[in-house]
Curated annotation (Swiss-Prot):
Residues 433-443 have a biased composition (Basic and acidic residues). Residues 419-432 have a biased composition (Low complexity). SMART domains: MADS. Belongs to the MEF2 family. This is Myocyte-specific enhancer factor 2C. It comes from Rattus norvegicus (Rat). One of its GO terms (cellular component) is sarcoplasm.
Length: 473
């Protein structure tokens, strides 16, 4: 297939004309170079374009060639455009048509080149669109952390934690919005986001505290979740986001504590301290999971008319199963459900009236038992000295229930030399579900968990009489 021929006429398109000039000028200089080398001659080219811009070429030196030209007086050959056209006609070639050695001079304006450029542009657009589709940002996971307290004028904290957010701050929310957010069968855990800092203690303590009605001088030193920032600033290296919802079908029953109905206008009593210390949930189905960001949630009853099991406590500090319970430990929990576990929901009314009758030895043993598990499992160091700010009187036995005199001392001695796992099983409550209803009527703790009523406070002689009757051995 022969070369494409172009018509030798003036190019009307300015851009095409400029492209053709540039290419053919270089081709002309290339031919002059080849001729000068092949035939050992001197060549000088002087070109002015349509804008009178000078382009020159000389095989050796332009001044030397021009000097020789001006001094040359011999006859010589001189050609013009008309001479070239006439010569081409004589040779049988059409002067208006010429084989184009540079057939791609106007490559930017030929139909073939336009199709090629159009295809290239389409490919580039497709590539850009694919990159945009692949650059979709990851979704944000928002997991709430709510901390309602049993007082009506308490604050509710919620923390929407995203995958890139900062879980260190707990913004405020309305209490009514978070009332049903803590179902006992669902564990909410925020996704891990690298090294996460600890929750500051000032954000977790109850913000609506009055010293009236609870016997404490400072509300922030009594029944709130007192967390020292130093213990919680431990960086936890997280690996992968744990499952967001864990149904009851995929895990064993959690250990829970039922809370008696709270007073309407008073701060949470020592029962909340005991609840905070005892209510550590163990997720046995997550034994393969790594340590993840904790979710600290406190939800206690807010109305005095609620039943014992109406709003169970959802206090939970969910971690990995570093101290998980084996099947033997779980089977041993049934013994403590009737003998030594502190099932707060089954405390009778008379026992609830003798909260401050707990002796110092029992309170210190209870605080040591629970704080040992907390310090080894979740670094939430709750000092046991909080529980010692109570009237120190011996524990009175139940009025209607008969209790052996040596039952409570045996319980404290049994707890003294126990490992953290066993102490957890003894300090934790019974399972969720139907076990709560069963153990209300079966077990009554010998330790009362609410302060005495005004009637009991005004009659100390009656309490001493019962004390002498119950412990006379």
């Amino acid at each position: 297939m022969g070369r494409k021929k172009i018509q030798i006429t003036r190019i009307m398109d300015e851009r095409n004309r400029q492209v053709t000039f540039t290419k053919r000028k270089f081709g002309l200089m290339k031919k002059a170079y080849e001729l000068s080398v092949l035939c050992d001659c001197e060549i000088a080219l002087i070109i002015f374009n349509s804008t009178n811009k000078l382009f020159q070429y000389a095989s050796t030196d332009m001044d030397k060639v021009l000097l020789k030209y001006t001094e040359y007086n011999e006859p010589h050959e001189s050609r013009t455009n008309s001479d070239i056209v006439e010569t081409l006609r004589k040779k049988g070639l059409n002067g208006c048509d010429s084989p184009d050695p540079d057939a791609d001079d106007s490559v930017g304006h030929s139909p073939e080149s336009e199709d090629k450029y159009r295809k290239i542009n389409e490919d580039i657009d497709l590539m850009i669109s694919r990159q945009r589709l692949c650059a979709v940002p990851p979704p944000n996971f928002e997991m709430p952390v709510t901390i309602p307290v049993s007082s009506h004028n308490s604050l509710v904290y919620s923390n929407p934690v995203s995958s890139l957010g900062n879980p260190n701050l707990l913004p405020l929310a309305h209490p009514s919005l978070q009332r049903n957010s803590m179902s006992p069968g669902v564990t909410h855990r925020p996704p891990s986001a690298g090294n996460t800092g600890g929750l500051m203690g000032g954000d977790l303590t109850s913000g609506a505290g009055t010293s009236a009605g609870n016997g404490y001088g400072n509300p922030r030193n009594s029944p709130g979740l007192l967390v020292s920032p130093g213990n919680l600033n431990k960086n936890i290296q997280a690996k992968s986001p744990p499952p967001m919802n864990l149904g009851m079908n995929n895990r064993k029953p959690d250990l829970r504590v039922l809370i008696p109905p709270g007073s309407k206008n008073t701060m949470p009593s020592v029962s909340e301290d005991v609840d905070l210390l005892l209510n550590q949930r163990i997720n046995n189905s997550q034994s393969a999971q790594s340590l993840a960001t904790p979710v600290v949630s406190v939800a206690t009853p807010t109305l005095p008319g609620q039943g014992m099991g109406g709003y169970p406590s959802a206090i939970s500090t969910t971690y990995g199963t570093e101290y998980s319970l084996s099947s033997a430990d779980l089977s041993s929990l049934s013994g403590f459900n009737t003998a030594s576990a502190l099932h707060l929901g089954s405390v009778t009314g008379w026992q609830q009236q003798h909260l401050h009758n707990m002796p110092p030895s029992a309170l210190s043993q209870l605080g040591a038992c629970t704080s040992t598990h907390l310090s080894q499992s979740s670094n939430l160091s709750l000092p046991s000295t909080q529980s010692l700010n109570i009237k120190s009187e011996p524990v009175s036995p139940p009025r209607d229930r008969t209790t052996t005199p040596s039952r409570y001392p045996q319980h404290t001695r049994h707890e003294a030399g126990r490992s953290p796992v066993d102490s957890l099983s003894s300090c934790s409550s019974s399972y969720d579900g139907s076990d709560r209803e069963d153990h209300r009527n079966e077990f009554h703790s010998p330790i009362g968990l609410t302060r005495p009523s005004p009637d009991e406070r005004e009659s100390p002689s009656v309490k001493r009489m019962r004390l002498s009757e119950g412990w006379a051995t």
